[in-house]
Swiss-Prot record:
Keywords: Activator, ATP-binding, DNA-binding, Metal-binding, Nitrogen fixation, Nucleotide-binding, Repeat, Transcription, Transcription regulation, Two-component regulatory system. It comes from the Bacteria. This is Nif-specific regulatory protein. A divalent metal cation binds at residues 468, 473. ATP binds at residues 254-261, 317-326. One of its GO terms (molecular function) is metal ion binding. The lineage of its organism: Bacteria, Pseudomonadati, Pseudomonadota, Alphaproteobacteria, Rhodobacterales. The keyword Metal-binding applies. Coiled coil: none annotated. PROSITE patterns: SIGMA54_INTERACT_1 (PS00675), SIGMA54_INTERACT_2 (PS00676), SIGMA54_INTERACT_3 (PS00688), SIGMA54_INTERACT_4 (PS50045). Residues 551-570 bind DNA. Residues 502-529 are annotated as: Disordered. GO terms for biological process: nitrogen fixation; phosphorelay signal transduction system. Residues 464-536 are annotated as: Inter-domain linker.
Amino acid sequence: MTDQQSRPASPRRRSTQSIADRLALDALYEIAKTFAAAPDPVAEVPQIFNVLSSFLDLRHGVLALLAEPGEGAGVNPYVIAATAFQRSPEAPAADVLPDAVARIVFRSGVPFVSFDLAAEFGAEAVPKRLRDAGQTLIAVPLRDPERSHFVLGVLAAYRSHDHNRSGFSDADVRVLTMVASLLEQALRFRRRIARDRERALEDTRRMLQTVTEQRGPAAPVSLDGIVGSSPAIAEVVAQIKRVASTRMPVLLRGESGTGKELFARAVHAQSPRAKGPFIRVNCAALSETLLESELFGHEKGAFTGATALKKGRFELADGGTLFLDEIGEISPAFQSKLLRVLQEGEFERVGGAKTIKVDTRIVAATNRDLEDAVARGQFRADLYFRICVVPIVLPPLRNRKSDIKPLAQLFLDRFNKQNATNVKFAADAFDQICRCQFPGNVRELENCVNRAAALSDGAIVLAEELACRQGACLSAELFRLQDGTSPIGGLAVGRVITPTVRVSAPPPEPAPAPEPAPEAPPREEVPLRTKTAQLSREELLRALESAGWVQAKAARLLGMTPRQIAYALQKFEIELRKI
């Protein structure tokens, strides 16, 4: 043993080492506290690097994880956190951590130290910001909390050194290894909490299902003819009960055939105006001139054929409710006239000068995208805000499938009463009906039930007797017409078509680019079947994802109308997601 080896460390060296150990201990204490209180440990890594920089002068911290865990052959790290680097999110991970270093740590699973990255891996391997100063890189593996043999990521930091490489010590490796261990424990604890939470939620779902099965099916919600037990229809009924007692205008929105007039009558029946009149006007069925006369009335002699004074619908609905169906179809010129009576409750008859005041509650309905119409200048924004005080969205029948059977039974009972018959549906017939999508909603369901009952040979309708089992489903035929596959002359006799499942055709083989097509006509002039035939399922899904699954926004992205988007959703059997 030499004298130098046996010589004890000097007091100054021991003091310096003691201070370094104390700083390392303090740093680990702060890091442990941070991880213990963090709901997301990875999100706290930048703060951890700040602690290492403040206490131990370890700068330029980097945490990189595998982009595709489990694929050892293709190590593809991406940086989660990188402090003290001027780096854009789009910059590659190699800007802060050399790829060669990441591969070494991922594959070996042991710490790595480099005093001169440029000498070992080339000048290009060194981050640009660190090329002008001596830097020691310390990188340690971050292991999967549940598979210790699998390296999940790399935790690295840089320390500046002089030409003698002073400043670095084995303590740096030990500290970073302990930080990685603390992060692993925090991740393990977080995963355990997530699993326990999921297990508790699953137990709760099972208990609720058991209780529901023991209680039996919920009683159908019935409110002035509204039938259903689904959560979607229950929410609509609850909204109607909340707003019916107020004087606020209600806007009913939904697809065609969802029963908007029925819900409008429910609003009226639940309101204090229930004993007053309920007057309905279909705004789409009348021209602008006739609509003005119908709503406001006219004086005798106001125009040719006005042989007597006629009260308008606003007057007739005084003290009650006026239902303006298809309000989205009125012309921009008439919208200003309607706005005045909605704002002030007064108007003049056509050809008259006397101002008439009324107390009428407005319930409007539309299946149009009014927001899109406002953006296009087709619908006045001030009128939109006046009628859309309480919007109620009526769910399509495909989103309330548990209501199909009670509704079908209601229509069957009504058919029997009207025709003095006693037709019943077999269980398999009900099952078949409940599997259908019904793009025409409740109106199509009623058509299906009445058709099956009218054409039935006996007292019981079997599944085989339904139109969809005989290749004569009306909604399926509509889809074939849009796709251009319907045979000329009508329905395809003998072809079995099930409208509940529609499989899209495989994409065609790539073909040479066609000749430039002539300029397309305006969007309103493009037939539905042309647009939907040109649209692919993937294009529709991409547009819906970009639009947050809002049909109106997706329609604008694709240059289509919301109605065309609705047909495309039915065509490709895509269910809307709630975000």
